C-alpha cells in the first residue's frame, strides 16, 4: 500500500505550494518521496504556460531507476509514469493539497526484482502484517495456533509462475512447519488476479483438495482490484510478465477527486 501512496504523492508533488510547476520543482518533490534514488527524470508539459495559472497541466512524465522506499526495505528497479491532463483548483494550493476538478488518470510501469521483493518479505513490517492477517482471518486460510511466520521466500518461474515458501512456527512445535506454494498467476479482465493450477504442501504433504479450494477462493477474493473502487480508485492491469529474476507490471490508474488516497499528503 505504501507504493500506491507514493505513486499518488508523486502526482500531487508536481504541483508546488506556490502554484508554479517546473521540471526541477516537480523532480525535487518526487525525489523527496524516496530515501535514495539512482536516477530520476521528470518532464512537465505545460503549454501554453498561462494554463498553469488556471489550474491545468497538460501531462507529467516520470522515469526513475533504483528507487528505495522510505518506510519499507524495498527498492523499485524501474518506475515509469505518464499522466493525462491534470486539472485542479488553484486556490486549493494554499492548503498544500490540490483539489482536483476531474479524475486523475495515469499509466504506470514497474519492474521489481526477485531479490528486492524477498528483502521486503523478510522485513519485520511484512511479517507483522502477515501475522495480523492470519489472526484476523476466520476462514480456512487461518492456521490455528500459529504464533509466527518466518523466512518467507519467493522465486519467479517461467510462464508467469512462482513458488513461495514460509515457515510456520507455534508454541507446540520445536521444528517449524514449512508451507510451500507453487502456482501460476493470471489476470482476468485486467482487474482480478487468480492463482492458476496451485500446488500447496505442508511439510511435504499436499493439502486436501477441498481445503485447498477454500484457501484459493479466499486468496482470489483478496486479490480483486475492484475492492479499491469503494475508495475512489480504479486500477486495470495492462501487462503482467513474470520471469526468472524479475516481475514487470503495467497498469492504468484512475482516481476520483473524492478518493481517500488523495488525502495522503494531509
What would you call each of these model-derived segments?
Residues 186-266:
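Extracytoplasmic/luminal low-complexity segments enriched in Pro/Gly and acidic/polar residues
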Residues 151-153, 182-184, 237-239:
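Short, surface-exposed charged micro-motifs
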Residues 135, 148, 160-210:
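Short helix-loop boundary/capping segments
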Residues 35-116, 124-127, 131-172:
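N-terminal beta-strand/beta-hairpin edge segment
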Residues 17-26, 109, 113-126, 207-215, ...:
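Short amphipathic alpha-helical segments
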Residues 1-74, 255-266:
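Hydrophobic membrane-targeting and insertion signals
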Residues 77-89, 179-191, 264-266:
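A short, surface-exposed beta-strand/turn
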Residues 104, 148, 179, 234-236:
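Residues that act as N-cap/strand-start positions at coil-to-secondary-structure junctions
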Amino acid at each position: 500500500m505504501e507504493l500506491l501512496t507514493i505513486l499518488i504523492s508523486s502526482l500531487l508533488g508536481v504541483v508546488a505550494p506556490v502554484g508554479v510547476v517546473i521540471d526541477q520543482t516537480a523532480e525535487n518533490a518526487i525525489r523527496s518521496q524516496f530515501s535514495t534514488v539512482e536516477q530520476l527524470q521528470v518532464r512537465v508539459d505545460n503549454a501554453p504556460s498561462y494554463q498553469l495559472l488556471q489550474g491545468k497541466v497538460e501531462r507529467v512524465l516520470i522515469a526513475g531507476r533504483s528507487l528505495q522506499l522510505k518506510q519499507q526495505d524495498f527498492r523499485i528497479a524501474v518506475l515509469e509514469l505518464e499522466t493525462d491532463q491534470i486539472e485542479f483548483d488553484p486556490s486549493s494550493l494554499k492548503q498544500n493539497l490540490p483539489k482536483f476538478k476531474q479524475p486523475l488518470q495515469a499509466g504506470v510501469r514497474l519492474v521489481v526484482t526477485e531479490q528486492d521483493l524477498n528483502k521486503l518479505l523478510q522485513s519485520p513490517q511484512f511479517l507483522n502484517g502477515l501475522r495480523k492477517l492470519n489472526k484476523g482471518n476466520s476462514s480456512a486460510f487461518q492456521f490455528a495456533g500459529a504464533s509466527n511466520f518466518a523466512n518467507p521466500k519467493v522465486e519467479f518461474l517461467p510462464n508467469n509462475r512462482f513458488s513461495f515458501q514460509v515457515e510456520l512456527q507455534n508454541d507446540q512445535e520445536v521444528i517449524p512447519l514449512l508451507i510451500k506454494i507453487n502456482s501460476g498467476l493470471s489476470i482476468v479482465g485486467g482487474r482480478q488476479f487468480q492463482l492458476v493450477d496451485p500446488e500447496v504442501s505442508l511439510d511435504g504433504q499436499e493439502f486436501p483438495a477441498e481445503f485447498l479450494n477454500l484457501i484459493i477462493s479466499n486468496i482470489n477474493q483478496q486479490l480483486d482490484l475492484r475492492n479499491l473502487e469503494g475508495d475512489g480508485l480504479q486500477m486495470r492491469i495492462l501487462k503482467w510478465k513474470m520471469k526468472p529474476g524479475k516481475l514487470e507490471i503495467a497498469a492504468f490508474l484512475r482516481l476520483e477527486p473524492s478518493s481517500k488516497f488523495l488525502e495522503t499528503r494531509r
